[in-house]
Design a protein with these regions (language model features):
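Short, charged interaction patches at domain edges and termini
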Residues: 1-13, 60-68, 106-152
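Small/polar-rich, solvent-exposed N-terminal microdomains that initiate assembly or binding
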Residues: 1-64, 149-152
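Extended hydrophobic/Leu-rich segments
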Residues: 14, 55, 75-77, 100, ...
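Broad gene-expression machinery/nucleic-acid interaction feature
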Residues: 50-52, 70-74, 128-132
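Active-site-adjacent structural patch at catalytic or cofactor/ligand-binding sites
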Residues: 55-81
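Short, hydrophobic/π-rich interface segment
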Residues: 84-106
């Protein structure tokens, strides 16, 4: 499990670099750089946390040959101006996705798959998006299966 947290930490560094120049609206009328959190964005006191990005290893699947991990990146913005928030959200999705996919291999062990999904949802004063990234642990999970597949 430590390795998955290390992967989340690597993603956090990339996202922090990506959003550090943004000045986004908050519920209390200020502007702020989005906070980047490992784990889900807490639902209590959103006015103190939003804008925020959360990084969660949301699921995994072990097969005979590989270990797959899905990491969901959630973005929550306060909506002061719907058009501006909508445009900002799409820019954040595009930039974060590009930067995370570009690296390819993380920690010499996790390879990101090029297939990813994203979606946006608006609810009340907040706009939320999620980006789902899929990773495969590179051949450190089961090496004995190679002999079995190759008939040795």
């Amino acid at each position: 499990m430590k390795k998955i947290y290390d992967l989340e930490t690597e993603l956090k560094l990339i996202i922090e670099e990506n959003v550090r120049y943004l000045k986004l609206d908050t519920a209390n009328g200020d502007v702020a750089v989005p906070q980047v959190i490992i784990g889900p964005i807490p639902s209590e006191n959103p006015e103190e946390l939003v804008p925020a990005v959360g990084i969660v290893a949301s699921s995994g699947k072990n097969t005979l040959e590989s270990k797959q991990i899905s990491i969901e990146t959630s973005i929550v913005l306060y909506i002061k101006d719907t058009g501006k928030a909508y445009k900002t959200m799409y820019e954040m999705i595009e930039n974060i996705s590009k930067d995370i996919l570009e690296k390819g291999i993380y920690l010499n062990e996790f390879e990101i798959c090029t297939d990813m999904e994203w979606k946006i949802d608006c609810a009340g004063l907040y706009m939320a998006a999620s980006i789902l990234f899929n990773f495969i642990r590179i051949k450190t999970y089961r090496t004995d299966v190679d002999d079995w597949i190759n008939g040795k």
